[in-house]
Amino acid sequence: YFNHPDSLTLENQEKISQALDTLGYKKNKLAKVLANGKSEFIGIIVPNLYLHYYSEMLTQLLSSYSNYHYKFLVFSSEHGAEEEQQYIEELLSYQIEGLIVLSHTLSSQKLASYQIPVIAIEREAEYISSITTDNYMGSLQATSLLIRDKCDILIHINVNVEKTVPAYDRIRAFEETCKEYQVPYDIDLSVSGNSYQEILNVIRRIFTRIEEKYPNQKKGIFLANDTYANMFLNLIFQKYGYFPDTYELVGFDNSPIAS
């Protein structure tokens, strides 16, 4: 009945179905796993959930259940490589069929050593499969927009990204485009922190520095992601009560917060 219902007559199928309803039968997923060796679990590791990009990506991944029926086990690895390795060992104990990694903690070579399918999203992925956006083109378009809008100084705000990480191309494209068009620019890679508040404090210091260093100039600010851009926007409104024409902001990621 469960594996080959077509081998039964419709009458017998109906009888069995009624009996199961009477008995209050519920499907036993564990029995199915033991029978076919497939857990239908996929592990997901994100670095945090306070950056809107990661929370939105997680939302999109989880919403795929209705189409593909895979279940997800999710860990947030905010405290280093040792913790992330423990999470992966825990996931492996559930016989996950694959792993989706958005964190940057473990090398792709280490991830490949676990001998399961691994998909990286926007991170170093020399030894595993990966999905990335065209970071260079996105940065080029953002920088070109600020140049076309005749900003006096262009400023890029980011973390100190390693060159092996795809997002480094945002920094590279910004600098190369500014040099090509011979426009003044400033790159600030001092953003860091392990919480939303810590990052906001850094963005606030950067905002204060920019205010002091570039008064009365039209400042074109290209921020590494939409969360940073939203923080910066709020700081502008907190100071001025409106959005002055001495600022133009561009984020990256198309997170819902940018709407």
Name each model-derived stretch.
Residues 8, 53-54, 83, 165-166, ...:
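Secondary-structure boundary/capping motif
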Residues 2-5, 49-50, 79, 106, ...:
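Short, glycine/serine-rich, charged loops/turns that create anion-binding
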Residues 22-28, 82, 100-103, 233:
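Short gly/ser/thr-rich secondary-structure transition/capping motifs
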Residues 29, 55-57, 86, 168-169, ...:
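Generic recognition of short, well-ordered alpha-helical segments
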